[in-house]
Regions:
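Conserved beta-strand positions in the central sheet of alpha/beta enzyme cores
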Residues: 1-2, 38-40, 75, 112, ...
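Short acidic, glycine/proline-enriched helix-loop-strand junctions
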Residues: 11-34, 93, 107-109, 195, ...
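Charged helix-capping and loop-helix junction motifs
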Residues: 15-22, 52-60, 87-97, 149-155, ...
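A short, flexible beta-alpha/helix-coil linker loop
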Residues: 6-11, 43-46, 80-84, 169-172, ...
């Protein structure tokens, strides 16, 4: 399960930045035997790391919260007006990540960058960040929409440069859209990747549980055949 820290700021804090809420998440995780495998700085959809001076604060707060939740991967999103479009923006972001990386290393948290740029551009940013704690959070849906060969990119990046995956093909159910998931799961398995892949699939409010079960059942079946 991936936890979003929310976007609405109250008294200078993100919604989950509350000891009682953190404790409740930990309790529910233990109670239902569902690990908190990652977190997300959702606030970066409002204050993007590519240029907003407020962004580093939210990332630093999120590193602390990720550690408190006993998790290891913090998703750093770059979408909408904050999507990376120019080399200058990518260079700035790589430098910003380099400044944030020491705190992530200290907390043993991976900063996973999720965006709409190519695998090659992502690697250039990682190399600019100069930290083993800055990796790619690979979203097969986003990269497909951006026109990239996702199987080729996954194999090229390798398990050393990918921290986690998002599996989705919105607005479709998995297996009913553009993406052929069998080659994707084959590629992930061939890497020897042993981390987490989260379903970030659309679901209808009135059929939420059924939709989640349908997508999970499908991807498990594909994994068994991979």
């Amino acid at each position: 399960m991936q936890i979003s820290f929310g976007r609405k700021i109250v008294d200078g804090k993100m919604p989950v930045d509350n000891p009682e809420i953190v404790a409740r998440y930990l309790q529910l995780s233990k109670q239902h035997s569902i690990p908190i495998d990652g977190t997300c700085v959702d606030r970066l959809h409002d204050n993007g790391l590519k240029s907003d001076k407020l962004a580093p604060k939210w990332v630093l707060d999120s590193i602390r919260l990720t550690k408190e939740l006993h998790s290891k991967v913090l998703l750093i999103p770059f979408f909408g007006p904050w999507a990376l479009r120019t080399q200058a923006e990518m260079d700035y972001t790589g430098d910003a990540l380099r400044e944030l990386a020491p705190e992530a290393e200290k907390a043993r948290v991976i900063l996973g960058i999720e965006d709409t740029i190519s695998a090659e551009d992502n690697v250039r940013m990682i190399e600019r960040a100069r930290s083993k704690n800055v990796l790619v959070y690979y979203d097969v849906g986003n990269s497909t929409l951006a026109g990239f060969d996702i199987v080729k990119e996954i194999r090229w990046l390798g398990k050393e440069r990918i921290c986690q995956f998002h599996l989705k093909d919105n607005p479709n159910y998995l297996g009913e859209g553009k993406i052929e998931f069998a080659p994707v799961m084959h590629a992930i398995r061939d890497l020897g990747f042993s981390g987490y892949a989260n379903l970030e699939t659309d679901a209808h409010p009135e059929t939420l549980v059924a939709d989640m079960r349908r997508n999970l059942t499908y991807i498990r079946r594909v994994m068994q055949r991979a």
